C-alpha cells in the first residue's frame, strides 16, 4: 500500500519524464524519418536518429509506468495496461500485422478505449465536459485505424475540423482551470500567446511561398499522420499546431502538468490511426493521454459521476 501511495505521489515526476521522452521520440524518430529522406543537408542526422530510438524505449517505459498508476483509479485501463505490457513481444510473431491476435487486440482496444475515456470523463469535474471533442477525436482515430487495418475501408471525414474543435475545447479547459483571476493565469496565457508567434510567422511565409507550401503539404501531414483533403488548408494546420502549443505551454505554466503532457501525447499520435497504427503503443497512447488530462480532476469535489449518481462514492 505504501508503494502504491508513493507511485501516486510521484505521478507528476513520471509525467514530466514521459513528456520529455515523448517529445524526443516524436522529434527524432516518429517525425524525423519523413524530412530525413528528402535531399536536405541535416547535420548529425545519424546521431539524431539514435537519440530518437533511445528516447522511444524510455517513452515506452514511462508510458507503461504512468498507465499502471492511472489504472489504480481507472479500472477499465487495467486490461489496456496489460496489452501495452505485452505489445513489444507481439511484433516477434511472424506476419503479426495480419494475425487474428492483432485484430482481436485492436478491437479490444477500441471497446476498452471508449470505456476508459468515458470513465475518465465522468470521474472528473464538470470542467472536463470541455474535453468531450478531444474524447471524440481520440476514439475516432482508433476507429479509423481498425476500419482500415481490418475492414480495409478508409474513414473519410474532415480530421482537421475535428482537431480544431478539440483545440477550442482544450483551450477553454486550460484557461478555465484553476484560478482564472490570478497573476499566474495571466502570465501563463501571455506566454502561451507568445509561443504562437513562430507559428504565425511560419504560416505567413507558407502562404506567400508556393514551393514551401507544397513542401509542407508533404512533410507536416506525414509527420502527424493527418490527412488534408484540401492542400490549401496547410496554413490552418500550422495555426492549429500553434494553438495546441499555446494550450500546452499555458497549461504547464499554470501547474497543470497532466493537461499539458496528456494533450501532447494525443496530438502526436492520434492521427497515425488514419493510415492504420503500425504499433500498438501508438494506438494506446491517445487513450492514456486523455486519462492523463482528466487525472488532474480526479480529486474534484463536484465530479460528473457524483452528479449522475449522487448516492455513489468513488
From Swiss-Prot:
Compartment annotation: Cell membrane
Keywords: Cell membrane, Electron transport, Membrane, Transmembrane, Transmembrane helix, Transport
Annotated TM spans: 47-67, 76-96, 102-122, 127-147, 155-175, 186-206, 233-253, 264-284
GO cellular component terms, semicolon-separated: plasma membrane
Membrane association type: Multi-pass membrane protein
Chief place of localization: membrane
Top-level division of the source organism's lineage: Archaea
Keyword Transmembrane listed: yes
NCBIfam families linked: sulfolob_CbsB
Name of the protein this chain belongs to: Cytochrome b558/566 subunit B
Native source organism of the sequence: Saccharolobus solfataricus (strain ATCC 35092 / DSM 1617 / JCM 11322 / P2)
